[in-house]
Amino acid sequence: MIHKLTSEERKTRLEGLPHWTAVPGRDAIQRSLRFADFNEAFGFMTRIAIKAQEMNHHPEWFNVYNRVDITLSTHDAHGLTERDIALAQFIDHVCAHTEPAA
């Protein structure tokens, strides 16, 4: 079984993810990104999808043109786990090298 983060673990782990916010009413985190255009957004999503498949941990996301909204939570644990933290860290790493639009 996958270990759901305790309140203290969650607080500590989220300190290292300043671009992510808690989802109201859910044990989940989210981040919104904007890119130069649809191709940039879709390319970003493709990179994340490949990693998510390797991890067997898939984000909830929404895309319209240059915008990508990502929500992370582990369904099997009914909340936030280390898998979500690891995927969020990977997403942040990709963003740091992709330069999303302001």
Swiss-Prot record:
Its EC number is 4.2.1.96. One of its GO terms (biological process) is tetrahydrobiopterin biosynthetic process. It comes from the Bacteria. It catalyses: (4aS,6R)-4a-hydroxy-L-erythro-5,6,7,8-tetrahydrobiopterin = (6R)-L-erythro-6,7-dihydrobiopterin + H2O. Keywords: Lyase. InterPro entries: PCD_sf, Pterin_deHydtase. One of its GO terms (molecular function) is 4-alpha-hydroxytetrahydrobiopterin dehydratase activity. CDD domains: PCD_DCoH_subfamily_b (cd00914). Pfam families: Pterin_4a. Gene3D superfamilies: Transcriptional coactivator/pterin dehydratase. HAMAP family: Pterin_4_alpha. Belongs to the pterin-4-alpha-carbinolamine dehydratase family. PANTHER family: PTERIN-4-ALPHA-CARBINOLAMINE DEHYDRATASE (PTHR12599:SF0). This is Putative pterin-4-alpha-carbinolamine dehydratase. It comes from Burkholderia ambifaria (strain MC40-6).
